[in-house]
Amino acid sequence: MKQVCVLGNGQLGRMLRQAGEPLGIAVWPVGLDAEPAAVPFQQSVITAEIERWPETALTRELARHPAFVNRDVFPIIADRLTQKQLFDKLHLPTAPWQLLAERSEWPAVFDRLGELAIVKRRTGGYDGRGQWRLRANETEQLPAECYGECIVEQGINFSGEVSLVGARGFDGSTVFYPLTHNLHQDGILRTSVAFPQANAQQQAQAEEMLSAIMQELGYVGVMAMECFVTPQGLLINELAPRVHNSGHWTQNGASISQFELHLRAITDLPLPQPVVNNPSVMINLIGSDVNYDWLKLPLVHLHWYDKEVRPGRKVGHLNLTDSDTSRLTATLEALIPLLPPEYASGVIWAQSKFG
């Protein structure tokens, strides 16, 4: 039996474990503070559900492990500075940017990047945290410790957000899912919609870009690339060197889920192109209690993470997939009264994708 240790024991590790069971792959999600002696890592392939981690007894051991897949890639992608430098090196389109080193740079920043600046911490900061949208009269809002520790990007006037989830094997082969349409609110992914056939031009551009990135890094496994949709084409926003929230729909909407695909890649199992036959919708459950009335709707698949419910915390998701888009939109309509009021706009957005 193959064994995989996942650095991190959140919901992504949990879903990797679930995906491993049918394949006979024992997956062990482990907390960063676990005692090394209690973790069966010696004969395991090592992967991670997070981009960066503190130094602990366990992470020191794993850093030396010869089967820690992508170990040297994580630091490059975890730092937005080196991530952006990678895009520039490969001549891939991304929002104009620079390192924000000193407060005195602001006039030149706005002169170069325009009236809206997006400041992001180089490391950490996700789901809208560690980011600021600033105009010239608002720069005093930025904490002093951010200088030297943040990048600043041009604010992009985009018409939509999409992500590409793909995987690369040890032999260099790559496979991809169709582009996923994403709705973010307050920096948090709320809803995703995927179709069997994405826009051909966007799909081709996205696959070419993500292939170049994975090839350059020698990356193995699933990677996600978030992009802005603009009249000039796609602009890369950020990368995630792991399974990704916007790929959760694949659990019920594809022949191979992103979680199984990642395990296949890192354990050197066959990596065929996943088949997607039907449209899918994913709704993130954020800071909401479970409601089993959702399961009265036959298209709804509930994935509950069994985490303490707190405001702003991802605690589960709902997947819906069907060949009949009218049945999908009707089910989404029936979900609205079963969800807290703040979900309505995301559900209506998903319905709008089906015309």
Curated annotation (Swiss-Prot):
<dbReference type="InterPro" id="IPR005875">
    <property type="entry name" value="PurK"/>
</dbReference>
<feature type="binding site">
    <location>
        <position position="161"/>
    </location>
    <ligand>
        <name>ATP</name>
    </ligand>
</feature>
<dbReference type="GO" id="GO:0004638">
    <property type="term" value="F:phosphoribosylaminoimidazole carboxylase activity"/>
</dbReference>
<dbReference type="GO" id="GO:0005829">
    <property type="term" value="C:cytosol"/>
</dbReference>
<dbReference type="InterPro" id="IPR003135">
    <property type="entry name" value="ATP-grasp_carboxylate-amine"/>
</dbReference>
<feature type="binding site">
    <location>
        <position position="80"/>
    </location>
    <ligand>
        <name>ATP</name>
    </ligand>
</feature>
<keyword id="KW-0067">ATP-binding</keyword>
<dbReference type="InterPro" id="IPR011054">
    <property type="entry name" value="Rudment_hybrid_motif"/>
</dbReference>
<feature type="binding site">
    <location>
        <begin position="237"/>
        <end position="238"/>
    </location>
    <ligand>
        <name>ATP</name>
    </ligand>
</feature>
<dbReference type="Pfam" id="PF02222">
    <property type="entry name" value="ATP-grasp"/>
</dbReference>
<keyword id="KW-0547">Nucleotide-binding</keyword>
<protein>
    <recommendedName>
        <fullName>N5-carboxyaminoimidazole ribonucleotide synthase</fullName>
        <ecNumber>6.3.4.18</ecNumber>
    </recommendedName>
</protein>
<dbReference type="InterPro" id="IPR054350">
    <property type="entry name" value="PurT/PurK_preATP-grasp"/>
</dbReference>
<comment type="function">
    <text>Catalyzes the ATP-dependent conversion of 5-aminoimidazole ribonucleotide (AIR) and HCO(3)(-) to N5-carboxyaminoimidazole ribonucleotide (N5-CAIR).</text>
</comment>
<dbReference type="InterPro" id="IPR016185">
    <property type="entry name" value="PreATP-grasp_dom_sf"/>
</dbReference>
<dbReference type="GO" id="GO:0006189">
    <property type="term" value="P:'de novo' IMP biosynthetic process"/>
</dbReference>
<dbReference type="Pfam" id="PF22660">
    <property type="entry name" value="RS_preATP-grasp-like"/>
</dbReference>
<dbReference type="GO" id="GO:0034028">
    <property type="term" value="F:5-(carboxyamino)imidazole ribonucleotide synthase activity"/>
</dbReference>
<dbReference type="GO" id="GO:0046872">
    <property type="term" value="F:metal ion binding"/>
</dbReference>
<feature type="binding site">
    <location>
        <begin position="153"/>
        <end position="156"/>
    </location>
    <ligand>
        <name>ATP</name>
    </ligand>
</feature>
<feature type="domain" description="ATP-grasp">
    <location>
        <begin position="84"/>
        <end position="267"/>
    </location>
</feature>
<keyword id="KW-0658">Purine biosynthesis</keyword>
<comment type="similarity">
    <text>Belongs to the PurK/PurT family.</text>
</comment>
<dbReference type="InterPro" id="IPR013815">
    <property type="entry name" value="ATP_grasp_subdomain_1"/>
</dbReference>
<dbReference type="InterPro" id="IPR011761">
    <property type="entry name" value="ATP-grasp"/>
</dbReference>
<comment type="subunit">
    <text>Homodimer.</text>
</comment>
<dbReference type="GO" id="GO:0005524">
    <property type="term" value="F:ATP binding"/>
</dbReference>
<comment type="pathway">
    <text>Purine metabolism; IMP biosynthesis via de novo pathway; 5-amino-1-(5-phospho-D-ribosyl)imidazole-4-carboxylate from 5-amino-1-(5-phospho-D-ribosyl)imidazole (N5-CAIR route): step 1/2.</text>
</comment>
<dbReference type="InterPro" id="IPR040686">
    <property type="entry name" value="PurK_C"/>
</dbReference>
<feature type="binding site">
    <location>
        <begin position="125"/>
        <end position="131"/>
    </location>
    <ligand>
        <name>ATP</name>
    </ligand>
</feature>
<keyword id="KW-0436">Ligase</keyword>
<dbReference type="Pfam" id="PF17769">
    <property type="entry name" value="PurK_C"/>
</dbReference>
<feature type="binding site">
    <location>
        <position position="120"/>
    </location>
    <ligand>
        <name>ATP</name>
    </ligand>
</feature>
<feature type="binding site">
    <location>
        <position position="184"/>
    </location>
    <ligand>
        <name>ATP</name>
    </ligand>
</feature>
